[in-house]
Amino acid sequence: MLDTGELRERFQQHYGIHPHVIVRAPGRVNLIGEHTDYNDGFVFPVAIDRATCVAARPRTDRIVRVMAADLHDEDLFSIDQIERSNRAWHNYIRGVVLALRTAGHTLSGADMLIASDVPRGAGLSSSAALEVAVAYTFQVLNRLNILGEELALLAQGAENTFVGVQCGIMDQLIAVFGRADHALLIDCRDLTYRAVPLPPSVAVVVCDSHIARTLAASAYNQRRQECDAAVRALQQWYPGIRALRDVSEDQLAAHQHELPEPLRARARHVVSENRRALQGAAALEAGDIATFGRLMNESHASLRDDYQVSLPDIDFLVTTAQSLAGCYGSRLTGAGFGGCTVSLVERSSVETFRHDLAQAYHDATGRTATIYVCRASDGVGRVMDNARPQE
């Protein structure tokens, strides 16, 4: 957990004055429903207790100054002249400010200091946490009236258009609407959601493989293009469909031999994953943890074989986790090509599970995994207001 008191003091040291506000936006781990959000589908994430915090004060001019405490790097730009930077982290912030300006919001400049304990490049949505935290900070400093849904869409738009990653809406929505001790079943078409309590007897265990992947440079955008191509191909038989979310498994099976690879496999994953997300949420609501775990295992097999976003070392982590006592299910989480796995584990077995998984991974690969239990947390909000902690 980030120490907001320390963040306040670091802001004071850097800018010579205390911050007006400190905002926190969480990372996320998706329990099931992977690569479905940009297909108008269903996802089932939790906001986690790792977050990005922004300490900030308003300025009287139109200049934005940003210090990234973790990177020991700075950015400075004018709200009136926002251009792309050759520093990747700059563009997430600049893109959000540009999105707010383009939406017609009146903005003043700001001095900001940013810190995060969401691992970068691990698939826990460090980028969305940053985008949402920055957007919410500007909302607070400028007394804007932006609904949570609009805030998430602005943040997503910044990543799509300014950063150049065609992400879906899940990461930004869970960063905004996350609820402590709950997962959210989100409909990524109409942006409605339902909070589902997490059973207290199980723990959400995340394993960071330390196989880093840069989302913008990966095959993520290619997968999205393949899904769009699959929709266009299926529209010759089903002209009413707008996205793979509209296709049933029976409809896909009826024309699977007429759909070329890899489009057939990509569509098969998305269509079946939507079913698994809905069934998984219903299973947890009913207290059927075993069924949820089985669906997690099926999800990973689909990501590995049909969506082809896993790697051999990730598969090793997943199959090892699935074999350990107390583990109900395990899968790749996030965009893939490295990053993290998520497992649902009986609380009484967590410490043995962590030790055995870390040991097996190190023995097999020589790498040291970081394994931690995630607590489902609330979405974006203020943790300090006018330099005072929130009650």
Curated annotation (Swiss-Prot):
GO molecular function: ATP binding; galactokinase activity; magnesium ion binding
Residues bound to substrate: E34, H35, T36, D37, Y220
Pathway assigned to this chain's UniProt record: Carbohydrate metabolism; galactose metabolism
Annotated positions for site Transition state stabilizer: R28
Record: active site: D171
Matching PROSITE patterns: GALACTOKINASE, GHMP_KINASES_ATP
InterPro entries named in the record: Galactokinase, Galactokinase_bac, Galactokinase_CS, GalKase_N, GHMP_kinase_C_dom, GHMP_kinase_C_sf, GHMP_kinase_N_dom, GHMP_knse_ATP-bd_CS
Catalytic activity, EC: 2.7.1.6
Pfam families found in the cross-reference section: GalKase_gal_bdg, GHMP_kinases_C, GHMP_kinases_N
GO cellular component, one term: cytosol
Cell location: Cytoplasm
Xref: PANTHER family: GALACTOKINASE-RELATED, MEVALONATE KINASE/GALACTOKINASE
Protein name: Galactokinase
